[in-house]
């Protein structure tokens, strides 16, 4: 088990303790330590207030000081150090109206979401587990700390996080926790879609995504999410991990819709990937010749092509026609990509200026069409990517 990240952070805890305060590792890192999983991020909780943390360390960043969180920069790494706190009443099912700093570890841990995330550990690797988190981990159960309805009323995102953890960890959800989700799922409509998308992205990549996705449907979670709320998501099936962007593309192809993606507030890159996924899925079934395969590999991101091909079972489960394996497979994609004479239009040895000068013509719609014709001719091997050869080909094959 890799404990090196704990060791790297140990001097921070020791320095806090040397100044008379308590300090512990907490949250996901401790959960993963107990499970024997790789540890990625270290979170630290302490009885010291933010002001006291800033006085102890020379290099700090007040990233969320009003909520008790200070980033301590140590050996060029950022560590989140958060003061023990009790939270006041929540507003809009998503954030506390205020926080009160406390000096008691138990009081801090009891406000956390799930028992598996409410375990603290000191520098001697002693665990502080007031809510039987280790027992739930051993039994592979996700259970809220305390009363489930109260935890979900505080922050409705915890319901989506619960399903995300189920997908990632292949845990079951405690009956009382699941029933509270059933009665309170409508509260996710109060959340920002950005927070939901972050959780869905992780959920869709989890090893147990099929079960969690089915729970999203049975709990009617999609009814309260922008974009998805207008669709019958019960018709969508996910049988293995895929990107969220691919899911959205599958939905678009399955229902033959062209809804705006703006309600999901995705990045430009995500929108671009979704549109490419749609084009790839529409193009795949019609590829029957080597020339078509060359243009297909040239026109689209090969990583996205491979993602679609690997997800063939998901496409089939949604009645979307896939590729012809004898013509299009991972090997032929790689071989075709390797043999392409160029990989984008910037590699082409002529441009619009050269063509206008050669043909003594002004710019117009013809130019875009001609550049595409040349592109196709080069990629499919009809002409070599050399200026003189291209211009000869233009003279012999093109009329404007």
From Swiss-Prot:
GO terms for biological process: RNA repair; tRNA 3'-terminal CCA addition. The keyword Protease does not apply. Its cofactor is Mg(2+). Its EC number is 2.7.7.72. It holds the Pfam family PolyA_pol. It comes from the Bacteria. ATP binds at residues 28, 31, 112, 155, 158, 161, 164. The keyword DNA-binding does not apply. A single active site specifically recognizes both ATP and CTP and is responsible for their addition. GO terms for molecular function: ATP binding; CCA tRNA nucleotidyltransferase activity; magnesium ion binding; tRNA binding. Catalyzes the addition and repair of the essential 3'-terminal CCA sequence in tRNAs without using a nucleic acid template. Adds these three nucleotides in the order of C, C, and A to the tRNA nucleotide-73, using CTP and ATP as substrates and producing inorganic pyrophosphate. tRNA 3'-terminal CCA addition is required both for tRNA processing and repair. Also involved in tRNA surveillance by mediating tandem CCA addition to generate a CCACCA at the 3' terminus of unstable tRNAs. While stable tRNAs receive only 3'-terminal CCA, unstable tRNAs are marked with CCACCA and rapidly degraded. This is CCA-adding enzyme. CTP binds at residues 28, 31, 112, 155, 158, 161, 164. Keywords: ATP-binding, Magnesium, Metal-binding, Nucleotide-binding, Nucleotidyltransferase, RNA repair, RNA-binding, Transferase, tRNA processing. InterPro entries: Bact_CCA-adding_enz_type3_sf, CCA-adding_enz_C, CCA-adding_enz_firmicutes, NT_sf, PolA_pol_head_dom, PolyA_RNA-bd. Homodimer. Mg(2+) binds at residues 41, 43. It catalyses: a tRNA precursor + 2 CTP + ATP = a tRNA with a 3' CCA end + 3 diphosphate; a tRNA with a 3' CCA end + 2 CTP + ATP = a tRNA with a 3' CCACCA end + 3 diphosphate. Signal peptide: none annotated. Belongs to the tRNA nucleotidyltransferase/poly(A) polymerase family. Bacterial CCA-adding enzyme type 3 subfamily.
């Amino acid at each position: 088990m890799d404990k090196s990240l704990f060791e790297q952070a140990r001097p921070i805890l020791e320095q806090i303790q040397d100044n008379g305060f308590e300090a512990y590792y907490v949250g996901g890192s401790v959960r993963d330590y107990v499970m024997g999983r790789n540890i990625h991020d270290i979170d630290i909780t302490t009885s010291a207030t933010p002001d006291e943390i800033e006085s102890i360390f020379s290099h700090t960043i007040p990233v969320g000081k009003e909520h008790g969180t200070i980033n301590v920069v140590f050996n060029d790494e950022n560590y989140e150090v958060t003061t023990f706190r009790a939270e006041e009443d929540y507003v809009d099912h998503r954030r506390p109206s205020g926080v009160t700093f406390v000096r008691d570890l138990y009081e801090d841990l009891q406000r956390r979401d799930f028992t598996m995330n409410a375990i603290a550990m000191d520098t001697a690797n002693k665990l502080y587990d007031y809510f039987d988190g280790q027992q739930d981990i051993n039994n592979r159960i996700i259970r809220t700390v305390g009363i489930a309805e109260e935890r979900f009323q505080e922050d409705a995102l915890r319901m989506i996080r619960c399903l995300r953890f189920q997908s990632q960890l292949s845990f079951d959800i405690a009956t009382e926790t699941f029933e509270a989700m059933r009665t309170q799922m409508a509260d996710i409509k109060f959340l920002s879609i950005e927070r939901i998308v972050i959780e869905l992205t992780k959920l869709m990549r989890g090893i147990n995504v099929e079960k969690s996705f089915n729970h999203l449907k049975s709990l009617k979670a999609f009814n309260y999410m922008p974009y998805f709320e207008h669709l019958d998501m019960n018709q969508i099936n996910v049988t293995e991990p895929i990107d969220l962007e691919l899911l959205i593309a599958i939905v678009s192809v399955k229902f033959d819709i062209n809804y705006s993606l703006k309600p999901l507030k995705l990045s430009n890159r995500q929108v671009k990937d979704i549109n490419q996924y749609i084009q790839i899925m529409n193009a795949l079934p019609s590829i029957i010749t080597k020339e078509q395969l060359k243009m297909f590999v040239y026109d689209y991101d090969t990583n996205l092509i491979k993602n679609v091909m690997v997800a063939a079972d998901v496409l089939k489960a949604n009645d979307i026609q896939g590729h012809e394996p004898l013509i299009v497979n991972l090997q032929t994609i790689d071989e075709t990509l390797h043999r392409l004479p160029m990989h984008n239009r910037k590699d082409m040895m002529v441009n619009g200026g050269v063509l206008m000068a050669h043909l003594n013509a002004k710019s117009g719609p013809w130019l875009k069409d001609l550049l595409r014709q040349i592109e196709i001719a080069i990629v499919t091997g009809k002409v070599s990517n050399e200026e003189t050869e291209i211009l000869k080909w233009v003279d012999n094959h093109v009329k404007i």
